[in-house]
């Protein structure tokens, strides 16, 4: 409801009159009461709501993904005309969007599955928008979406036509997977700095402030520096009194499931999903901590040197994560015939969304130079960073392993990097085993 309200207010602020409807009359009245003088027109029946719109109608749905979306569409259909456009701005599973697009197209309606990133504030002030569906229908809503989208530093709006049917929601799903990876990498950096150097929250805030002024400049690093200094009403640092269980809404899981379907090695992002799952086993972990032994963390040595190693490890880990995510976009584009423009996708992530970061411009540049590049690690800029920073990543992972500090995504970054650059892997033995017990055959070199 909040996302829908904020998007309506955003659209209204750009000079449009907006018809609004909610199943709950009270919710509709609440929005009107809280926003006097706005060009928001309330309707209390679906029929009146639909009939208030000029044709072709442009209807933005902001409902909980799943059966609720189908129910909302079914309630609208009796009052729609051929050519009307439904825009689903929820966190919808892309296969559902493909199905709805197919079904509605058969009835003469247009359907645009649209990823919206930026949270409640982004919805109000300007989100990153990822629309997918009929190109001709997108052209009819593009003027509105362009006006309400976030604007990057170069003045470009953070919206672009992604591709047919479920492409927009797919890109939003992978965006969320990358977000999981970013957040877990940052959490592991925090754990290393606390465990290895015993940094105070003030020192952590200072470190992240410095990081945010360099290569790691991003929304997530920016908010993390603020989190470290936030105190509760009792004067305690808030981060220290928050239970160490990270919840999830399932979009990271969808990204990993799709990777398995496509045969894509999305190891870092998948480890970040598993890290949330194991964090949720709090009672088991507390019990296991009293039974299972491991090394006590030893000081990590020179403070400035270790902080710089962790910074480099974090940046290279982030690059590996995005390389995996964009490789998956490439595989999905081929599988679903979407013809995705990876450079444009990186561009619309530069503002408004949760993963907005300075280095996204480097991704756009890499695809501008070579649109068909198989993996971002092969692009000159990222290859150079890997050359320069891999030793720091290896040192940090080795320190963590020796000192019993779990770093699943840092470790996944090293393993993926070494696997991807290996001309030969021991999979020949696995194939021999498969042939031995199951007559699966094998290929000779």
From Swiss-Prot:
Per the entry, what this protein does is: Catalyzes the oxidative decarboxylation of 6-phosphogluconate to ribulose 5-phosphate and CO(2), with concomitant reduction of NADP to NADPH.
Q: What is its EC number?
A: 1.1.1.44
SUPFAM superfamilies listed in its UniProt record: 6-phosphogluconate dehydrogenase C-terminal domain-like, NAD(P)-binding Rossmann-fold domains
Q: Which residues form the signal peptide?
A: none
Q: Gene symbol?
A: gnd
Q: How does it assemble?
A: Homodimer.
* InterPro entries for this protein: 6-PGluconate_DH-like_C_sf, 6PGD_dom2, 6PGDH_C, 6PGDH_Gnd/GntZ, 6PGDH_NADP-bd, 6PGdom_BS, NAD(P)-bd_dom_sf, Pgluconate_DH
PROSITE patterns associated with the record: 6PGD
* Catalytic reaction list: 6-phospho-D-gluconate + NADP(+) = D-ribulose 5-phosphate + CO2 + NADPH
Which pathway features in its UniProt record?
Carbohydrate degradation; pentose phosphate pathway; D-ribulose 5-phosphate from D-glucose 6-phosphate (oxidative stage): step 3/3
Spell out the molecular function terms from Gene Ontology. Answer: NADP binding; phosphogluconate dehydrogenase (decarboxylating) activity
Q: Name one GO biological process term.
A: pentose-phosphate shunt
Q: Which residues bind NADP(+)?
A: 1-4, 22-24, 63-65, 91
Question: What is the name listed in the Swiss-Prot or TrEMBL entry for this protein?
Answer: 6-phosphogluconate dehydrogenase, decarboxylating
**Residues at which substrate binds:** 91, 117-119, 175-176, 180, 249, 276, 434, 440
Entry's family note: Belongs to the 6-phosphogluconate dehydrogenase family.
- The answer, when asked if Oxidoreductase is one of the entry's keywords, is yes
